[in-house]
């Protein structure tokens, strides 16, 4: 069985992935610049993969966790902020959100990789960290990311 800390890690990771997929779809369809659209495509693809990998790690360990069916209020607000934005304003909001969301994801993964109490999850966090750090690096180069 999972500790509360591991359970919280999984839920936060799942919410982050879910937000990235939804926001990425919007960026892919509504992004004004090609850079934003391509980044959105990559987020959908990479975070779908991460969701599947995390599910496999949990299954292999016999710890099925029901991940949230809907976004939490904070991520929902972020999606709503994108929904009402148009054109360059959309690109700017998406870019700024992506930098902060990936900073948060890096911190979450680093923390669990260092002190998580489930070995399989810790290994997954370590492996995932490099990809998410790369996402952060790319997000920081998006047009409008500087605010």
Regions found by a protein language model. Give the residues of each.
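His/Met- and acidic-residue-enriched segments that coordinate or traffic transition-metal cofactors
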Residues: 1-147
């Amino acid at each position: 069985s999972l500790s509360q800390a591991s359970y919280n890690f999984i839920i936060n990771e799942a919410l982050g992935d879910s937000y990235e997929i939804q926001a990425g779809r919007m960026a892919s369809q509504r992004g004004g610049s090609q850079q934003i659209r391509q980044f959105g495509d990559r987020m959908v693809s990479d975070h779908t993969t991460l969701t599947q990998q995390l599910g496999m790690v949990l299954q292999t360990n016999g710890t099925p966790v029901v991940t949230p069916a809907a976004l939490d209020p904070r991520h929902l607000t972020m999606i709503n902020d994108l929904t009402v934005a148009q054109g360059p304003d959309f690109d700017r909001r998406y870019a700024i959100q992506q930098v902060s969301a990936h900073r948060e994801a890096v911190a979450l993964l680093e923390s669990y990789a260092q002190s998580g109490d489930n070995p399989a999850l810790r290994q997954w966090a370590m492996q995932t960290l490099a990809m998410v750090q790369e996402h952060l690096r790319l997000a920081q180069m998006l047009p409008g990311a500087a605010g």
